[in-house]
Amino acid sequence: MSALVFAVLTALTGPAAFASDTGSAHKLVSYPPSSQLDFSGTLETPAGQHGFLTTGANGHFYFADGKRARFWGINVSSTRLDIPPDQIERVVENFARAGLNMVRLEAIDNRNCLLGKVDSPDSLHFDGRYLDRLDHWMDSLRRHGIYYYLDLLDFRTFKSGDNVLNAREMDRGARPYALYDDYLIQLQQDYAKRLLTHKNPYSGLMPVNDPALAMVEICNEHGFFLYPEKLETLVEPYRTDLRNRWNRWLRDRYGTREKLQAAWGDINGFTVLRDDEDPERLSVDLPLLTRAFANADPMAADIRRAPPRLRDGVQFLTELQRTYLRTMRDYLFSLGLQAPITAVVSNDVAPDIWSVAQECDFTAENWYGDTIKDDPRTPGLRYYSNHNPLREDGPLGVAPFTAGLRWNNKPVVIREWGTIWPNRYRAVSEPELLAYASLQDYDAVLLFGYQTNRAPNGAEADALNDYAFQVDPTVWGLHAIAGQAFLTHAIRSADHTATLVYPPAHLYDWPAHLSELHRASWSVRVQSRVATSRPDASAQTPTGTLSDLQSLRELLNYFGKRGVPISEKSLTTGVWHSDTGQITRYDHDGRLEVSTPTLAILSGELEPGHLYDVGSLHVSTANRFATIVAYSLDGLPLARSRHRVIKMVTRAENSEEQLDRAPKDAPAPWQLTTAGAGPVVTFGSGSIAPTKVWIEPQRVNGKPVPLPLPLLTMDMVSGTWEMELAAGTARLLCDTVEIHGTLHGRDFTTSDEAVVMKFEKKKKLIGITAAKQ
């Protein structure tokens, strides 16, 4: 049987069809709903009726009326926001149907967006059409019960027409100049004032007065430490300005050159402070923070990398960054802004993220399970790791990497995430983020992203593309159900907390990176703080050395001796249990299992024909890779629920897509030889070996229960299907036609219409029909 397309599900559940705004000749695009279920009723309309969002003392978001707030949403970025109002309305309706309660409007200052065309002489004026469309977005989101999140400095291109000196030499976003140059900070404030205090003609509200504006980001992927190599290539007059600030800081700290020299001491027989360096003459160099930078004078490089100079340099830059954040924060509050504020820097550098936790209301960061890599030798080709993220349990895995955000008991927002196309293991990404965002009790999770029109690379929105999941059944197809599980706390947060303690004397050590200790986040909640002592073994001090691995063993064993189902054995077996017992990660097998009273998930690499028992969910399948989710929609345990949904996704590619092994010297193991185009195919076909699904308790009165006849069988490999069971009726959608299956032993065959089955109370089948919604 030939592969069928994900658009079949769209036809069954109601398409949202739009024409591209960049030309009437472009084809109509249908955006599939995430699920056949309509979750819009879970949203309270309009957004903001509980008052402005605030931060609580317990490190979570609350509304003004005391209700705790959690968010699950998506990003719409840059030129993807530039679509007609009727299309905006339909996209937002699709988000509401998915039950999303937050949308981040990202990079609105990008080229050809709010600040005008790329060839505009300055970046001081708003483009009227783009602003109008942005106003439509904000108003439509508010009306549908969806909160919105705004960035201020993303990719703004400062120009000579702004009276910015050497603007042409700056990267987009003016990294890192925008952190310390007074005029650039003034321009950022002017931009923020114009954006946040303009009156939206559709809502009648200024954003600062709109409680649907839930979060504001001062700067996106910025800071001194995200790209430290930029400090080596600063242009004038900014280079001299930063150097002078550094020397004045040293003078204020040490008083005299002699005291500075004594504090910095010697390295390899040479004084760290060179003879020609004197803070009084503003001649002391900043440290060299990047390992990759090749200095023509090796001895000079060593002196600039001396630990005392490094520590002082990192502290100086951290304090300067804090001044910037505090200045911007205070200015935004002076405008009347009531929404919580953050800035996005590098969460794997302790002083960097600590500076945000000190000055802002919450911390935020990205996590990606795969990224695009380029090779100048092969322009046009893109390279990917194409690995299964569930096989990664090191510090760069989703839980350890994002756990680095938890500082000062501030709320945590994963404001961008995704395992991007064409990674073949994307179907694990939603379960993985859901599991560990729940375990760590994060406050917002926002998928990146959603394409609405033709992309700059020419890809239409009906195709899989870079950071675009709107037609991806393996990601977007799970996003609504995963969101409901997150928003209803279907997975418990961790019962225990591990604290990473950074002594003040070592906070500014360089190089800085995530520690092996962050891996404890696979099992318990992880937080970080600056302190001088550790109360017990649940608190450990990262050193950035191999000793951190031994500290991790001690930490895991500490909890294990107190009855928690974890120990250092996870480091060798690759099996990680959450302290709640609800999440099990099989790193060596590339599989994740989640079992709670109302939710069961089996995701990852599977052994065909093997029976997997995940709580009340029991699955056997011919697929070697899949995600299957069962969720109770009425809050009752899965086996007793009267309203539940079961969904299975496997793989999805563009038509004619070709992902090949890359040459050995390529930057990543796989290359995208041909991107392909829409429609998306899922390769569903008939199979002699069926997928079998049971929803039954494993034990009754403490005794094992033999499995009865399967609830559902599907004689299919690959493909996507979803079944809702409610009030004596089952409704099954499958993106592949002519697939034989059974429900409680009764045969059916899929078609391009939904199969609807009715039951009596004791599961007796009384009829089968095919119907369109």
Model-derived regions: residue spans:
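Active-site mouth of glycoside hydrolases
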Residues: P46-D330, S334-C360
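Short, charged, surface-exposed secondary-structure boundary motifs
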Residues: I372-T378
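A general structural signal for short secondary-structure junctions and capping/turn motifs
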Residues: F95, S140, L205-V208, D352-V356, ...
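N-terminal pre-domain segments of enzymes
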Residues: S20-H50
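Long, low-hydrophobicity ectodomains and other hydrophilic envelope-associated domains
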Residues: T488, S493-Q773
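Bacterial N-terminal signal peptides
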Residues: S2-G14
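Signal peptide processing junction and immediate N-terminal pro/mature segment
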Residues: G14-A19, V208
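Catalytic-core region of carbohydrate-active enzymes that cleave or remodel glycosidic bonds
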Residues: T197-H198, Q321-T342, D348-D370, Y383-R562
